[in-house]
């Protein structure tokens, strides 16, 4: 699973006392997620602590639970060592957006479980 969400140590978010459900219309946050059904995008943070715990209770073994930042930095480091030309072709700004803690690096989590 790869999504934005909270881990077991930061759920529920103290800065989100009303929960994590949000509505966006034209890329702007809306005040009421129930207004204008079908005309706005609804989203919510995943509870990775609960997902991890539920998987383990069902017999899955957690192989990896980390931030997108750590996951992608590790994956790209291995790829760049084996194929240095890839680093020249990569758009560094795109990689930074995916891995920077203030952008998508920390809010997105990676959970890998197996039987």
Question: Where do the PLM segments sit?
Answer:
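Long, Lys/Arg- and hydrophobic-enriched amphipathic alpha-helices
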Residues: 1-115
């Amino acid at each position: 699973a790869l999504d934005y969400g909270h881990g077991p140590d930061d759920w529920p978010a103290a800065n989100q006392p009303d929960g994590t459900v949000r509505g966006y219309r034209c890329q702007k946050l809306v005040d009421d997620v129930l207004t204008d059904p079908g005309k706005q995008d609804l989203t919510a943070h995943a509870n990775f602590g609960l997902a991890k715990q539920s998987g383990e209770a069902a017999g899955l073994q957690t192989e990896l639970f980390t931030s997108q930042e750590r996951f992608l930095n590790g994956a790209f480091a291995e790829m760049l060592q084996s194929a240095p030309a890839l680093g020249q072709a990569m758009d560094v700004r795109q990689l930074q957006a995916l891995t920077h803690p203030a952008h998508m690096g920390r809010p997105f989590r990676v959970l890998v479980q197996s039987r």
